[in-house]
């Protein structure tokens, strides 16, 4: 018996998905559209009946374990998607897919290959802002675009969205061959299925720390625009590998900026983080220094270049982040571990953050700092409860929540900006501009000169190589918030023999 498929939403997206299923013939049969539009309920579209309203008709459908529902309403707000999902689950649907809505709703395109299993990202948080990708990506038409860290969560989503940008070439740079291979293959499949435009996609394996190789890559690719996402980012891991954090994040960024200025790259966009604000971890300091580098190199840019950074908070679903961790803990029966009942974070979905980054890359000016409006913070314990419920379970009854205390480099609240940065609205929704907080002349260069022999073997300074105690001392001398945080931890009696 063919799998019966119910498509939620009989609009353009739903009809296109139905057409794809009919053409491919191997995914089952579309049994009906479900829709709330009274003007089409009771009609047929290409021989497929339209039933509704969604909430009412779902309860009387006869469905088996094989049957599948596809939510194809990319314009629907998050609250409505959540309601539809809960209705489907309540009425016995075990297989629920969704057509993500960031770009499809704007461009009027939809493809079966873009559907995926629904996950908590689709029903958590606020409704993402709708951005016209084709309009915001006009500055990339016919250009060569390079993404560093293209195999990561942000880099790979930028690559997916850039398929709609009309770029001539899309370079995927990363040091992990598996992740680069994965996104490269995914983009090729999307292109084969008609998603986006026919950019030439080129995978490149390389290490940001290799100055000569990075210079060679930028020269050879003749890229016009760089989105710099590559970074070591896991805070506790970087507290155990402090030299590596500075070596890769700071000097890798410097290498890329040197090459970008030298080879006249038109636009350079650094992806930054709220952990760069009054940092309390080596990772946070590394990203703060990357921001300072961008402001410094903007002064070296010629009149046709624009060097900028875009800062934002946590994204839901990134690798190694809280959401995948909670999901894996639920799969093993719990408990879910939460740092503190008061801990809260700003969250945004990866597709929304990337759409705003791409828009900022086009409208941003040289030497400017930008911040994405993250909305209101969410308590981590509330997020844990929502994810447990999404899994069809009850918090504390089926899955326990355990308070475990802060890890190295963590704080209960992450500020998005310093008071003196004074964020102001721009002409573009959810994109704020910051007042630059630059180092005085010579301060950054002096610090980097002292950090260099710690990160890279240097004749005459062999004793400094990989000396993390000296590295942390230098960082604490430069960054008061890091020094204060480490001293507070030491006072609290926590063991920090690795750094103090």
Residue ranges of model-derived segments:
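A solvent-exposed beta-alpha-beta segment
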Residues: 1-94, 178-182, 199-202, 206
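Strand-loop microenvironment adjacent to phosphate/nucleotide-handling motifs in alpha/beta enzyme folds
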Residues: 5, 24, 130, 135-139, ...
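Flexible, Lys/Arg-rich cytosolic regulatory linkers and terminal tails that connect or flank
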Residues: 82-144, 261
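NAD(P)-cofactor binding segment of oxidoreductase domains
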Residues: 82-99, 169-176, 220, 240-267
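Conserved Rossmann-fold cofactor-binding substructure of NAD(P)-dependent oxidoreductases
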Residues: 202-225
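Proline-aspartate-enriched helix->loop->beta-strand connector
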Residues: 61, 65-66, 167, 218, ...
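Conserved Rossmann-fold NAD(P)-dependent oxidoreductase catalytic core, especially the SDR/UDP-sugar
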Residues: 105-113, 228, 232-235, 239-288, ...
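N-terminal Rossmann NAD(P)H-binding glycine-rich loop of SDR-like oxidoreductase domains
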Residues: 145-162
């Amino acid at each position: 018996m063919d799998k019966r498929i119910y498509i939620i939403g009989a609009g353009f997206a739903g009809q296109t998905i139905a057409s794809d299923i009919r053409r491919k013939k191997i995914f089952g049969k579309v049994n009906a559209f479900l829709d709330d539009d009274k003007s089409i309920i009771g009609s047929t579209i290409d021989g497929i009946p339209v039933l509704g309203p969604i909430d009412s008709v779902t309860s009387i459908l006869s469905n088996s374990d094989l049957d599948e529902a596809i939510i194809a309403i990319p314009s629907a707000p998050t609250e409505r998607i959540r309601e539809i999902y809960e209705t489907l689950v309540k009425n016995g649907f075990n297989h629920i897919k969704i057509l993500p809505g960031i770009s499809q709703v704007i461009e009027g395109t939809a493809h079966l290959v873009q559907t995926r299993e629904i996950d908590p990202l689709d029903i958590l948080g606020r409704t993402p802002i709708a951005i016209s990708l084709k309009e915001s990506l006009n500055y990339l038409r016919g250009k060569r675009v390079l993404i560093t860290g293209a195999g990561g969560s942000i880099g790979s989503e930028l690559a997916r969205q850039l398929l709609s940008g009309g770029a001539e070439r899309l370079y995927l740079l990363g040091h992990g061959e598996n992740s680069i291979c994965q996104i490269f293959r995914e983009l090729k499949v999307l292109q084969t299925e008609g998603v986006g435009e026919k950019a030439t996609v080129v995978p490149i394996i390389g290490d940001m720390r290799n100055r000569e190789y990075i210079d060679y890559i930028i020269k050879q690719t003749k890229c016009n625009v760089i989105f710099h996402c590559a970074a070591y980012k896991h805070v506790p891991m970087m507290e155990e590998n402090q030299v590596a954090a500075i070596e890769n994040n700071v000097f890798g960024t410097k290498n890329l900026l040197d090459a970008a200025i030298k080879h006249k790259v038109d636009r350079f966009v650094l992806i930054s983080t709220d952990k760069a604000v009054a940092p309390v971890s080596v990772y946070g300091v590394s990203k703060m220094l990357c921001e300072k580098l961008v402001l410094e190199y903007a002064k070296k840019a010629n009149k046709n270049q624009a060097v900028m950074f875009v800062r934002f908070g946590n994204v839901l679903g990134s690798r190694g982040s809280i959401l995948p961790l909670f999901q894996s803990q639920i799969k093993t029966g719990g408990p879910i571990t939460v740092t503190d009942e008061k801990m809260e974070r700003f969250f945004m979905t990866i597709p929304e953050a990337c759409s705003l980054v791409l828009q900022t890359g086009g409208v941003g000016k040289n030497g400017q700092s930008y911040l994405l409006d993250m909305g209101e913070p969410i308590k981590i314990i509330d997020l844990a409860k929502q994810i447990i419920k999404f899994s069809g379970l009850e918090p504390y009854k089926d899955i326990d929540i355990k308070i475990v205390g802060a890890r190295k480099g963590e704080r209960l609240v992450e500020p998005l900006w310093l008071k003196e940065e004074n964020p102001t609205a721009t002409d573009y929704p959810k994109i704020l501009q910051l007042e630059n907080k630059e180092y005085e002349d010579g301060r950054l260069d002096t610090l980097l000169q002292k950090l260099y022999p710690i990160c890279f073997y240097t004749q005459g300074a062999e004793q400094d190589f990989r000396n993390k105690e000296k590295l942390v001392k230098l960082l604490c001398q430069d960054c008061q918030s890091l020094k204060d945080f480490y001293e507070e931890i030491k006072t609290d009696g926590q063991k920090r023999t690795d750094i103090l």
